[in-house]
C-alpha cells in the first residue's frame, strides 16, 4: 500500500461520436491509462473516466446522411469506441456519453450559476446563414482563410495552423461547408460567457504549475491579445441541449463537452454509492483532478474550462497535461483527410501490447509530436519485449519445471535483486511525471543486466554436470525473480502480459511485493507469452490503410525528420550510388577494433547543426563521441540502445570537445541514416569479429 493514499480523478479528452478511433486518438488513452494503472498499482484510489462527445452539427448532419436518428448513431459509435478501447486494454472506471441526463443537468446547473453570478451576457449578433440550406452555420461548418495567419481552408472557430480562435464572421472568403454556398449575414440573439472577467484568476492559475511550461507560455500570447467574450450559443436546428429559458437556442458543444467529465463521474457515483461527487468536484475538494488532452484543445481546457468551474463554484483541475500529435512514417495524421490507421485495423493485425509499449517508450512529459515509425516499431518490440524481457523467462523456466519440481530456490546471492529493487523509486518518479520513455529505458537496462547474468552463467551448460545442479537452480531462480520484478515495473504498460506472468508465477504482481521471497514457491509450466512482430502482418495493416500512410506535404514542418520504412529518397540500388571501395588486405582490416557500445546518454550540441554528443559504455570504460546523426535521431530515441563503434580511432579534438571514436551507421545521409544495432545477446565491450 502506498505510504499516503491519494484520491485521484483522471480523464482523457472525449472522442467525438461521429467516427472511429484511430491511432492518433490511442496515444492519449494509452498515456492516460498507463498513468491511472500506475496510481492503482501504488495503492491509490484512482478513477479513470471518459465519455463520447456526442453533440454538434457534424453529428446531426451525418445522421441525416445515414438516414437514422442522431441518438441511434451515437449509441452505435459509443459501442464501437468502447470495444476498441477495451481491446487495447484501456481500463476506464466509467465510460459514458455527453448526451445523458447527468450531463444535461450538470450543463444547466453550471450555466444557471454563471448567469446568476453575472457571467452570462446576451446580445444580438450577425450570424452566417446558408441561404441554400436555410440554416445558421455553426463555426465548424464555415471554412475560409484564417484572419490571423492567412492560412486557407480553416474552420470558423479556430485555425489548425496557428492555433488562433476567432468568430466565423472574421474568416476571409467564407464558404458553407454544407452546401458550398457563400453565406449571408442574419441577426440572432446569442448568450456569451464573460471570459475577460476571469483574466486575473486565469493568469494566476496558468502559472501555478497546473500546466506545462510550453502551454503556459502559449497562453501568455493569448492574454497579450486580450481575452474575448465566448459565444456559447447555437441556433436550431442543432443536436445538443437546449439552453434553459431560451427556446430554440442550444449550448455550443464546447460548453457541455468538458462538463462531460463531471457528468460521467456523476454516473459513476450513481453506480457506486460510496463515492461522493462533491468530494472530488466541490470548491474545497482536497482530491486530485487531472486532464490529459491533445495540444490542439489547450485553449478550451486551460481558459474556458477553469473559468467556468471557478465562476460556478466548483474546483479547478490540479493539472492539464497536453501531448503532441501522432505521425505515421513521418506523415501527419488527419481524420478530415483520411490519413489515419483505425484502431480496429491495427487490432485486426497486431497485438495491442506492442503499441502500448512503443508509445510508452517514446512518450515524455513534453508536448512533442510522436512518430509511429513502423520499421522502428517492429525492431523495438522484437528487441525489447521478445528478445530481452520474455526471453529471460523462456530460457530459464523450463529448467525449473523439468529438473527442480517447478519450485524456485532460495537465492543466496541477492546482489542483483537488490540492484533491481534500488531502481523502484526512480522508475516510480518517471511514471508519476509521465516520463514513460525514461522509465522504459531504465527497465530495459535492467533487462540487459539480467540477460547478461544468464548468458555468463549459462545454466544450459550447468545442468549437464551433476555437481552444478544447485548452481543452475540458483541461476534460473534468480533470473525468474528478476523477470518478475521487471514485469511488475511494466504492469501499467503491459497489463495483458502482466496477467499472463501472474498466472505463470501463480501470484499477483504488486508494487508492495517487489521484494517478496519466493523460496520454495511453485511456478506453472512456462507458456509462450509474446510473439515477434511479423513484417507481413505490419505490411497487411499498411495495405488496409494504404491511402492513409503516404508521406505528403501535410507532414508537420516543425516535426523532427523521421526515418521511414521505405524512404523514397533511399536508392533501391545502393551500390549504384555508392560503389564498393578498393580492395584492402586482411592486415589493414585487422587494425580496426570494432566494439559493442551502449549509448548511455545522448544530447544536442549547442551551435552544431548535425552533431549529437554520445556517452558510450564499452564495458568498464566510457567514451565520448560526436556523431553526425542529428538529422535522423532525437537524443531520447538513442539512449539505452546498443550500437557498434570504432574503438581504436585516434581521438579527434573538435571545437565542441574531444571525440574518442566513431559509431557506425548506414544510409545516404540526412534523415536516411540508421545506426547499427547488434542482436540483443551482444554486450558492451564485446569485439565485433
Swiss-Prot record:
Keyword ATP-binding on entry: yes
Sites where the protein binds ATP: 335
Stretches assigned to coiled coil: none
Cofactor annotation remark: Binds 1 zinc ion per subunit.
UniProt KW keywords: Aminoacyl-tRNA synthetase, ATP-binding, Cytoplasm, Ligase, Metal-binding, Nucleotide-binding, Protein biosynthesis, RNA-binding, tRNA-binding, Zinc
Motif ('KMSKS' region): 332-336
Residues bound to Zn(2+): 146, 149, 159, 162
GO molecular function: ATP binding; metal ion binding; methionine-tRNA ligase activity; tRNA binding
E.C. code: 6.1.1.10
Gene Ontology process terms (BP): methionyl-tRNA aminoacylation
Subunit record text: Homodimer.
UniProt similarity note: Belongs to the class-I aminoacyl-tRNA synthetase family. MetG type 1 subfamily.
Function: Is required not only for elongation of protein synthesis but also for the initiation of all mRNA translation through initiator tRNA(fMet) aminoacylation.
Protein name: Methionine--tRNA ligase
